[in-house]
Amino acid sequence: MNVLLCYINTLNRFYDISAVEVGQHFYWQIGDFQVHAQVLITSWVVIAILLISTILVVRNPQTIPTSGQNFFEYVLEFIRDVSKTQIGEEYGPWVPFIGTLFLFIFVSNWSGALLPWKIIKLPHGELAAPTNDINTTVALALLTSVAYFYAGISKKGLAYFGKYIQPTPILLPINILEDFTKPLSLSFRLFGNILADELVVVVLVSLVPLVVPIPVMFLGLFTSGIQALIFATLAAAYIGESMEGHH
């Protein structure tokens, strides 16, 4: 009898897992347009966290830095090092862009694990990390594409497009395809990792609600930070490559 009850409980848990929805969305109707409300709400929360924390720390800088000031200075120095390593000596103007990408993605990824999005009920779907949605990651990747095209054209003018026929014009289609695959690889890598992490946690919580999901959540926090670093580093590398030439 006990074996039968355990079997039934296991089936019930798998039934609960099957009810987990990935594609449900909540939209706002603005005129003739449907706006993806989930992504906007969570993105605004992440932006608010970044703005408020920055204002609180830097509005009154101290001669002897506070712990918060030390942290922000360390983050800025870290972003400068990444930008300089990937872009070169002309990295200065690109530090704000690379830093914004890194901080937004980092806080977005961590918000999926640390913020209780589930307590906010929506008519359809549920709130999650902004980077859990392909719309966000594609938008970030397209911004990166615009940035490295701008970097190359602003430095070399129309001669920038000469890279597409180097080292031989036969490679023109491949070189063009490469520029299209860069944003795709950036967006799908980030989206896939964050979505997979959240789904694994949901499944484990459904099966074993107590202790087992905790190590996975800590691993998710670590990989979320790594994904933010990878995205920012690759964005800086693409910008540096467009300014230096085709490699």
From Swiss-Prot:
GO cellular component: chloroplast thylakoid membrane; plasma membrane; proton-transporting ATP synthase complex
InterPro entries with a match to the protein in the record: ATP_syn_F0_a_bact/chloroplast, ATP_synth_F0_asu, ATP_synth_F0_asu_AS, F0_ATP_A_sf
Membrane spanning stretches: 38-58, 95-115, 134-154, 199-219, 220-240
Coiled coil residues, start to end: none
Localization in the cell: Plastid, Chloroplast thylakoid membrane
Similarity field: Belongs to the ATPase A chain family.
Protein name, per record: ATP synthase subunit a, chloroplastic
Primary gene name: atpI
